[in-house]
Amino acid sequence: GKIYEQCELAREFKRHGMDGYHGYSLGDWVCTAKHESNFNTAATNYNRGDQSTDYGILQINSRWWCNDGKTPKAKNACGIECSELLKADITAAVNCAKRIVRDPNGMGAWVAWTKYCKGKDVSQWIKGCKL
């Protein structure tokens, strides 16, 4: 995995076409990544309730989005192995996140976005970054 610097991650998200994707700004994505994983691509968190695991910089869940071979009734809507989401290269995580925000909930799929980023001035997350 890799722990990104804030502006470095903003540049990566921008390079992957996330600025304005489905109406969400770069600040929304950087804010969400900060509160989900502290910018760490290797982050994992197990959810005892449904026995799923959240993976990577955006903490994408194995119940719906990726396959880890151990989550009951998993859907794998992104069609990827969860291990792809832990790589230093965030391409797989970004592509899956794009799939997730196309759902009616949008970024509401991320608890951290709803709690810490929604309705806030998220431009502060990219302030001073050379983008």
Swiss-Prot record:
PROSITE patterns: GLYCOSYL_HYDROL_F22_1, GLYCOSYL_HYDROL_F22_2. Its EC number is 3.2.1.17. The gene is LYZ. SMART domains: LYZ1. This is Lysozyme C. Residues 2-131 form the C-type lysozyme domain. Belongs to the glycosyl hydrolase 22 family. It is found in: Secreted. It holds the Pfam family Lys. InterPro entries: Glyco_hydro_22, Glyco_hydro_22_CS, Glyco_hydro_22_lys, Lysozyme-like_dom_sf.
